[in-house]
């Protein structure tokens, strides 16, 4: 056969390399599901309104609505504050980053709330009304320790006896102290009771007899501590039996805070010794005593006078005990 004979044409029909092949750009199984439709301005607005109704958070760049309770991983968690006032739900959502109208935590790892100027002003005023100290940097109000004027002088501590008063309290306590006749120490804020000298106002007379002089000298009762004498009979004899009263004892017992009792000085009684008279005359049980054992103004007491004398003593002691125990 001739070499020039017809050959199969190279340009004949062959399987086309450019024939139909699976398109690389054709539909493939989507790993993440159907993509959201790109948003235009109208779509954003519609989606934002839907999101607002569900109280979610709308992302304009992703055209997505995130539930308020479930923030996306890429977004910082924003919890609604409990103390700062919430902004209204009807605020329009814009694609621009939101400026907080409330004090909200900027992230979970940061405790300091972030405030805008309006919020700082509002929170600052609230804090001032509460008497606190406002920190504009972290938008927090720290309660200031409230220093109330004392209504009483209180001890500064359990182990400290000194009282701490302000000037107003010192004036008040000083006035109270003056009214009760005390002496006020402004340094310690304490009132010390001044010894009260109650001078005798009247010299009462008891019944007199021809044998026993019973003129009553003035009362030696002065300050409260003077009322509670160890020997009730000291007062008893001063009350009822001037002429049998030992004037030295009178001076000693009437020495209340320097008070002077002329009756004690003027007594012309014998130096008989009050306690001797007491031992002979007075018995708490009201027992008898021997006739003639006691002389008053040089006279011996008769049985009748003796009985009256004993009864008067007992009645007087009872009255004095009632006074001293009241």
Curated annotation (Swiss-Prot):
Presence of the UniProt keyword Secreted in the record: yes
Compartments where found: Secreted
UniProt GO cellular component terms: extracellular region
Comp. bias regions, Low complexity: 1-33, 93-102
Composition bias, Basic and acidic residues: 34-51, 107-119
Keyword Repeat appears in the UniProt entry: yes
Residue ranges the record marks as coiled coil: none
Region (Disordered): 1-119
Reported tissue expression: Salivary gland.
Alphabetical keyword list: Repeat, Secreted
Free-text function comment from the UniProt entry: Used by the larvae to construct a supramolecular structure, the larval tube.
Full protein name: Balbiani ring protein 1
Organism: Chironomus pallidivittatus (Midge)
Species lineage: Eukaryota, Metazoa, Ecdysozoa, Arthropoda, Hexapoda
């Amino acid at each position: 056969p001739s070499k020039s004979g017809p050959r199969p044409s190279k340009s004949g029909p062959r399987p086309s390399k450019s024939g139909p092949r699976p398109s690389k750009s054709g539909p493939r199984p989507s790993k993440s599901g159907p993509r959201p439709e790109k948003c235009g301005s109208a779509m954003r607005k519609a989606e934002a309104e839907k999101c607002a109704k569900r109280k979610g958070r709308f992302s304009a760049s992703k055209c997505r609505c995130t539930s308020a309770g479930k923030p996306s991983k890429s977004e910082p968690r924003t919890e609604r504050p409990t103390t700062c006032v919430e902004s209204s739900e009807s605020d329009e959502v814009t694609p621009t980053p939101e400026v907080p109208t409330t004090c909200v935590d900027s992230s979970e790892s940061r405790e300091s709330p972030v405030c805008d100027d309006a919020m700082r002003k509002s929170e600052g005023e609230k804090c001032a009304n509460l008497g606190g100290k406002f920190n504009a940097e972290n938008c927090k109000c720290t309660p200031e320790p409230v220093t109330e004027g004392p209504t009483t002088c209180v001890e500064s501590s359990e182990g400290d006896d000194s009282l701490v008063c302000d000037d107003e309290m010192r004036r008040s306590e000083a006035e109270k102290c003056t009214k009760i006749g005390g002496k006020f120490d402004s340094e310690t804020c304490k009132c010390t009771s001044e010894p009260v000298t109650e001078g005798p106002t009247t010299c009462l007379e008891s019944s007199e007899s021809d044998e026993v002089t019973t003129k009553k000298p003035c009362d030696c009762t002065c300050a409260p501590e003077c009322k509670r004498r160890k020997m009730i009979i000291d007062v008893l004899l001063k009350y009822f039996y001037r002429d049998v009263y030992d004037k030295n004892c009178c001076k000693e017992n009437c020495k209340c805070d320097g008070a002077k009792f002329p009756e004690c000085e003027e007594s012309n009684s014998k130096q008989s010794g009050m306690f001797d008279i007491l031992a002979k005359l007075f018995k708490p049980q009201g027992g008898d005593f021997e006739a003639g054992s006691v002389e008053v103004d040089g006279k011996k007491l008769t049985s009748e006078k003796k009985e009256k004398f004993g009864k008067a003593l007992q009645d007087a002691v009872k009255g004095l005990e009632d006074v001293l125990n009241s």
